[in-house]
Structure formats: C-alpha cells, structure tokens
Design a protein with these regions (language model features):
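The substrate-binding groove and active-site-proximal loops of carbohydrate-active enzymes
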Residues: 44-57, 80-98, 139-147
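Small/flexible residues
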Residues: 36, 118, 144-145
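N-terminal carbohydrate-binding accessory modules
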Residues: 1-74
Length: 147
C-alpha cells in the first residue's frame, strides 16, 4: 500500500482566540490554527501521571527518565493534602514529600510539570486527598447534595 501525504503550502492561520504566553525563563507556548508551538516549533504535549509522594525519593529520577524515554514530555502530579498535613497545622515537605525537589528534578530531566493542587484528588487516595482530621472540624459548613 502506498500513501501520499500532501502538506498544505501555506502557513497555518492564527488561532481564533489569541493563545500565547511566555514564562519567566523566556520560553513561549502558543497555538495556531493547526497545532501548538513551543519556542516557535511545533509541539505535541504528551502527559503522564506520577504521584511523587508515593515513591521513594531515590527512585524518582529513574522513573522520570523511563517516562521521558517513553515519549512523555510533561508530568502531571497531585499534591495530596493528606500527605503534607497529616496532623492539623503540622506540614511535612521532607523526603518523598519534597515538592520543590521533585519539580526541580523534572526540570533537570527535561520534563514540564502540571501541578494538580486539589484540594480534591482522584488518585485513589483516602478521603479524596483530604486529611483525616478535617472530617472532625466543626468550624465551617460542609458541602451537601441535600436540597
């Protein structure tokens, strides 16, 4: 079987809505009528999920490199509240919970990051990622489906 692919001779038209942004490092993400561009070059984002707080910190780099080798260029990750404030008012961003170290490592490996900050998380996490102590709080109204 022979396939003939004909590419349009004209440049892609700008998108209907202006979509362009430049980050503090000077990199630009934009869209035209056909595709996304990153620093002016066509870009196809491929995202994979990695819940850093569920892995030993020493395993992060190896696993991220596997993802990159598989074609992933953006890592999405939840910030599970339940992992960072197990006890009310006591925050833990050490070891496997070190968000800053994880994001910096993603940059070192060459992966972008989408932070999924919640508070609700659909990552098979108890209480949807809310800390256990929150269910005993009485100083706020709880959301309900009741009329």
């Amino acid at each position: 079987m022979i396939y003939d692919v004909k590419l349009p001779k004209h440049a892609p038209s700008p998108g209907i809505l202006p979509f362009c942004g430049t980050n503090p490092a000077g990199h630009t993400l934009a869209a035209n009528g056909r595709y996304l561009t990153y620093d002016g070059k066509p870009f196809f984002p491929v995202s994979g999920e990695f819940h850093f707080a569920r892995y030993r910190r020493e395993d992060w780099e190896r696993e991220l490199r596997k993802m990159k080798a598989g074609g992933v260029n953006i890592v999405a990750t939840y910030i599970f509240w339940i992992h960072h404030e197990e006890e009310k008012g006591v925050f833990d961003f050490s070891d496997r919970r070190d968000l800053r170290a994880f994001v910096e490592l993603c940059g070192k490996v060459g992966l972008g990051v989408i932070l999924r900050i919640g508070p609700w998380c659909h990552g098979e996490c108890r209480n949807g990622g809310f800390p256990d102590w929150i269910q005993f709080q009485t100083d706020f109204a709880r959301r309900t489906d009741d009329p």
